[in-house]
Regions:
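Polytopic transmembrane helical bundles with strong interfacial aromatic enrichment
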Residues: 1-128
C-alpha cells in the first residue's frame, strides 16, 4: 500500500511540474500541436497518479494481486503513454508514436484490474 501512495505522490508532483513547463517553457520551442500533446501527457499522468491512491486503498482492503496488477499497469501506462507524448511535445518527433497506444492499453488493463479487485473486496456493511 505504501508503495502506491509514494508512487502516486511522486507522479502527481512530476505531472504538475511538467504541466508548468508546458505552460511556461515550451512556447518558444515547439508549435501548438506539440504543446497540446505534451499537456495531454501531463493530464493523463495526473489522472493515473490519483488512480494510484485508489490502488493503495484497494490494496489496504485486501485487494492483493489485482491491486498490484492495476498499480503496475498504471505505472507502465504513464511511462509509455505520457512519456511518448512528452517526447513528441519536446522534440516534435513522432518516433515514439507507436508506443502511445500500448500505454493506453496499459491504462485500460489497470482500470479493469482495479474494478475487479474492488468488486471482490469484502467490506463491512457492503452485503458482499
Amino acid at each position: 500500500m505504501k508503495l502506491w501512495l509514494i508512487l502516486g505522490a511522486i507522479s502527481g508532483f512530476i505531472s504538475v511540474a511538467l504541466g508548468a513547463f508546458a505552460a511556461h517553457g515550451l512556447q518558444a520551442r515547439v508549435g501548438p500541436a506539440e504543446i497540446a500533446a505534451f499537456e495531454t501527457g501531463a493530464r493523463y499522468q495526473m489522472y493515473h497518479a490519483l488512480a494510484l491512491f485508489a490502488v493503495a486503498w484497494v490494496a489496504a482492503q485486501g485487494g492483493g494481486s489485482l491491486a498490484s496488477l492495476a498499480g503496475w499497469a498504471f505505472v507502465a501506462g504513464t511511462i509509455l503513454f505520457s512519456g511518448s507524448l512528452y517526447y513528441l511535445g519536446i522534440t516534435g518527433s513522432r518516433a515514439l508514436v507507436l508506443i502511445t497506444p500500448i500505454g493506453g492499453v496499459s491504462f485500460l488493463i489497470g482500470w479493469a484490474s482495479l474494478a475487479v479487485g474492488a468488486y471482490a473486496l469484502r467490506l463491512p456493511g457492503s452485503g458482499g
